Amino acid sequence: MKRILTVAAGLALALSALPAAAKGDAEKGKQLFYTCTGCHGIADYKNAYPTYRVPKVGGQNEGYLIAALTGYKKGERSHPTMQAQAESFTDREIADIAAYLSSLKPAQ
C-alpha cells in the first residue's frame, strides 16, 4: 500500500510539472492569416488545381485547425501550397492562427 501511495504521489508530481497546452493568441493569428486570405478569403476560388475548391476556414474547430496545419507541416496531408505555407509556421503560430479562425463565425 505504501508503495502504491509513493508511486501515485510521484506520478502526480510529474504530471503537475508538465506545461499547460498553449492557448493561441487570436490577435497574432489574425496578422498571420493575412497572407492566407489570398486563397481562403475569395468566394468560390479555385487554385492551380481547377478541381480543388479552396475551403473557407473561419469558424472551424480550433483543434481540427491545429491538427490540419500540423499535418501539412509534417507532410502527413498532401497539398503542395498548404505544405509550403505550414512549414513556415512555428507550432505557436499554428496555435495563434487556429485561435483566430475558430473565433470567427462560419462562412455561409
Language model feature labels by segment:
Residues 14-19:
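N-terminal signal peptide c-region/cleavage motif recognized by signal peptidases
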Residues 23-54, 71-81, 104-108:
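Periplasmic/extracellular electron-transfer cofactor-ligation site
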Residues 1-8:
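Bacterial N-terminal signal peptides that target proteins for export
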Residues 54-62, 84-94:
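Electron-transfer interface patches adjacent to heme c in soluble/periplasmic c-type cytochromes
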Residues 88, 92-106:
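C-terminal structural segments of small proteins and small subunits
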